[in-house]
Amino acid sequence: MRKSLYLALLGSMIISTAIAGDVTGRVKYIGKPPKAKRLRMDADPVCAASHKETALAESFIVDADGNLANVIVYLNDVSFNGNPPTTPATLDQSGCIYSPHIFAVMAGQQIDILNGDKTMHNIHALPKVNKEFNKGMPKSLKKISTVFKKAEDVFVIKCDVHPWMKSYTRVFDHPYFAVTNTDGTFNISNVPDGTYEIIAWQEKFGSKRTQSQSITVKGGKATANFNFERPDRKSVV
């Protein structure tokens, strides 16, 4: 009896794995990209001295081929009954810059916030659904941890000591999301077969100008590509 139950459970696991696949794609920007702005760090000599070259804002990272980095791509309105990852996400403060600039987590997933700088920072998270917090991190404090318990749209985490320091995060109630790499590619893993709405969010375009489309995951795979482009000024009200 136990052997039969074990085989049944094993078979169920294999079937579950077989019908879950990857959603892959690439996000591009069409047109001439905006010039990256210089981050002025003169107010804190420690920050300024940590960069041999000019530090640039990361709000719009696009390569020569138009591939767009730091875009959150996710499946919308999906159900998930599993648990958040046990591996913490990491938000580092290095050279007085948040890294990663854009990231996403599951509700209930631990976030380790690191301070590798020899200067004072403070972590000021500004969610609307989850609890706002503002925690100081002197140079002697190398790590603090936090958890956002509820799903929430993108919000900013900033440093009030260094106003140029900003990171953006979104909290999901499922694991079907990714952030594009420097070549614009993304991979959302373990997606069950089915039809979904997939959405792409980019910082400068914001939540009112996301890109979306319908995809069907069949046979364990699907592809979705997105193109962001500067809107016609005449069409902007």
Annotate the PLM regions:
Residues 1-8:
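Bacterial N-terminal signal peptides that target proteins for export
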Residues 20-235:
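Extracytoplasmic copper-binding redox domains, predominantly the cupredoxin/blue-copper superfamily
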Residues 8-16:
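Bacterial N-terminal signal peptides
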